[in-house]
Amino acid sequence: MFNFGNLAELMKQAQSIKENVEKAKEELKNEKIVVEVGGGMVKVVSDGLGTVLDLEIDKSLLNENEYPVLKDLLIAAINEVSERSKEVVADKISQATGLPMNMSKFGGMF
């Protein structure tokens, strides 16, 4: 026989998880991740969701001869800040859902 008490408890837990995930999203929007590459020549700042908020480039890289170096550093910085934001998201989701970090990377929540 079906136990409606268990269903009610499950629905309550689901609502709690949803609220925790929404709170985590807000916290991630306010999180700042800073990455510096090339000895600080390029700096990228993103929020915890991976949106790039700021980019600083050493003026010595802003000449035509340094373009290949600048391009490589920008790619490295953006990729690193993206990877770090994924780690921050996984941690926040793990905290919000109670799931282990490797299980909290399920698709599309953020």
Curated annotation (Swiss-Prot):
SUPFAM superfamilies: YbaB-like
InterPro entries named among the record's database cross-references: YbaB-like_sf, YbaB/EbfC
GO molecular function, one term: DNA binding
Coiled-coil regions listed in the entry: none
Protein origin, superkingdom: Bacteria
This protein's UniProt keywords: Cytoplasm, DNA-binding
Places the protein is found: Cytoplasm, Nucleoid
Location (main, coarse): cytoplasm
Listed GO CC annotations: bacterial nucleoid; cytosol
PANTHER family given in the database record: NUCLEOID-ASSOCIATED PROTEIN YBAB (PTHR33449:SF1)
Family: Belongs to the YbaB/EbfC family.
Record function comment: Binds to DNA and alters its conformation. May be involved in regulation of gene expression, nucleoid organization and DNA protection.
Assembly information from the UniProt record: Homodimer.
Name of this protein: Nucleoid-associated protein SYO3AOP1_1366
Organism this protein belongs to: Sulfurihydrogenibium sp. (strain YO3AOP1)
